[in-house]
Amino acid sequence: KSIRVVDSRMTAGGLFMLVRRARELIDAGGTLNDIADKLETEKDRVHTYFSVRDLTPLRRSGRLGLVRQSVGTILNQRPILKIHDGAVVYYEVSRGLNEQLRKLAARVPENAEEIVVEYITEAQAANRLAEMLEKKCGANVQLRKVGPVLGIHLGFDVIGTSWKDAAEQ
């Protein structure tokens, strides 16, 4: 059998969307090369932003220094991070839960085709974010729990959103 590797440069909800799209293309009778080519194109339309409340796991994984963690904890800062070319990149900072959710929701364009809200233990916050996105985008937002591996690296209070940009006409 033939194999084609597609590096999604993504995780969690973004990866979920690409895997689901691959399944749809398989079910529609797509060939291996057609499916891989479409996924290579579509992966550039998928985005993921996320945030955490507790900065300790970011410090332990080397993504944040001790001083920055201490100051961030005192000021109730919650970093907004994004996945860019397969790497976790700092985007901006928020203070408190309300601003954290507002800033995450602000990243998603109103015409997003598909939206996923990811969380591990923060179900209430995830539901609030999903409601905000449903109002803003008029789209059905899927809630998904992410696995413990992300929890180990980012913290179990991680909350994020992934979406697919609307297709160009």
Named regions from a protein language model:
Residues K1-R4, M10-Q169:
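Mixed-charge interfacial surface used for oligomerization/domain docking
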